[in-house]
Amino acid sequence: MPKFNPISRWSERNQLLVLSLVVGIVVGLAAVLLKTLISVLQEGLRDAFGGVLGGSLYYLALPGIGMLLAMLFCKYVIKDSIGHGVTKALQAVSRHESRIRPHNMWSSVAASSVTIGFGGSVGAEAPIVYTGAAIGSNFARYMGLSYRSMTVLLGCGAAAAVAGIFKAPLAGVLFVLEILLFNISMTSMMPLLLSTVSATVVSYTLLGSSTPFECTLTPFELKNIPYYIILGLFCGACSIYFIRTTLKLEDRIGKMENVYLKWIMCAVGLGILIFLFPPLYGEGYESLGVLLNGKELSLDGQTPLAFLAHSPWSVPIFFMLILLLKVFSMTLTNAGGGVGGTFGPTLFVGAIAGFVVARTLNMLFDGTATSIPEQNFVLVGMAGLMAGVMQAPMTAIFLIAEISGGYDLFLPLILTSTIAFGTTRIVEKYSIYTKRIAQRGELLTHDSDQAVLTLLKVSDVIETDFSTVKIDDTLGRLVEVVSESTRNIFPVLDSVDRFQGFVSLEDIRKDMFRTDEYETLHVFNFMRSAEEYVYEDEKMDSVMKKFEVTSAWNLPVVRRDRTYVGFVSKSKIFSAYRDELKVVSQD
């Protein structure tokens, strides 16, 4: 119930419009706060330890300290896991009725700012998306809005987060439509637009008019189209590597039960990687700024491997190593207790991919009239990786165009993003955010039918008003139970309430009046075995397949040890399906 709702007399649609504006402002402030905290921490630590980043051995320890602080905060203060923010927002929509715990309105900002501020090799985008989603969800719950409005407001918060941190309102809307709320209707666009615009205005007001990736672009030339095709294919290959390597590393490290041993291993590994490859420090956006403006990234005095940058052919090799190792540094940061996302690393890897392709082509064409604009390829590569890793080509195209002012590169952005998306899709059906959710059968899709089945839970449709009998009860006892029941199915249990089968009224109709056999016939003489069982925690999609295979109208619900729970029926499921479909599709 809402504690205080001064606009409760308004229609829910009007309440939603007002709240979307408020959510946008609040999330915009949260995005500014996160960026400011990260910047202050990084500058303060740099001043405290002095010198250039990679020139100090202290930076071997700094990222690990940040990871430890974030881990202790999550373990002992909020006592919750808050990593993988975008994935958790998706889970909130599909499995938790769009409800997110109140502490997520601030905890992700606190933990991620420490993680990244100390040099953790992750992005700030996913934590702020989860923060925004939590703000939208809790505002809606506080105001007593419906599930549908709560879901839209959750999306408004996520969209505002992207818009606020990148100053890209259109990209924020597209992010929600492509990645987060697959089944949102077009009439929900106005709240999304209001929230993204208000968040962007807040960001511009407090942080100035500069965009995150200001760059010097070269006018697009049609003769370079074949090279953008090559870039698209390369980005697709990098996307597949990014998704598969990340998930496999997380699974392998996740098997370690001792969190402190896990932290030590990840902290040492991350420290060594950053010491050898300084661009892996933090989000890496400073290095991207250098590449986007066509400048050479100076590594002298920063790393023992600086000599690799002195030979022309060593430069693309060095950056290729950075590209490959960014996935490791990101995963080590998250697995070791840090809080951050894959959004920023995706942009980083995409930029490096674009640079490697452009620099390699320029070296191959050395001495010819052909010249590949490296800064253009850096920018377009960012879109290519986003399209592949996130499976969101529209978001990739418009985000890169908005944050760079690179609308002149629309054609190569579209071309590269489409090819990267298509290449990745051939091998990986799901994005890095949705793969694990899809494997558990919890992913909402654009298919309304599948979305409703995902939202339905077996626990919502279980019927428990069936009179049970024991397997060794007599016919007389069975007739007594039948006379007191309004059902025509009677579950049969053993002595410890494990389901054995069922008796139908039709099975005993002819024997009900044969009183002379009341003590000689028993329940097991009439019992039928169930063709299939339904488990309490089973996905509704699986349940419907069992109904289809068996042609049954009712199926028993049991726990994993076959303890009887109840029955589910087609009629109850269809009724719940209609009700849920109305909620999902209403405007």
List PLM regions with ranges.
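Nucleotide-binding motor/catalytic cores of P-loop/tubulin-like NTPases across gene-expression machines
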Residues: 505, 520-523
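Alpha-helical transmembrane segments and immediately membrane-proximal extracytoplasmic
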Residues: 1-455, 459-465, 469-490, 494-500, ...
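Phosphate-coordinating loops and pocket residues in cytosolic domains that bind phosphorylated ligands
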Residues: 191, 463, 510-514, 528, ...
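Glycine-rich acetyl-CoA-binding "A-motif" of GNAT/NAT acetyltransferases
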Residues: 499-502, 563-567
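Ca2+-coordinating acidic residues in Ca2+-binding motifs
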Residues: 507, 525, 569-572
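Structural signal for short hydrophobic segments within the conserved structured cores
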Residues: 465-469, 525, 530-533
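The conserved cystathionine-beta-synthase
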Residues: 469-486, 493, 512-515, 519, ...
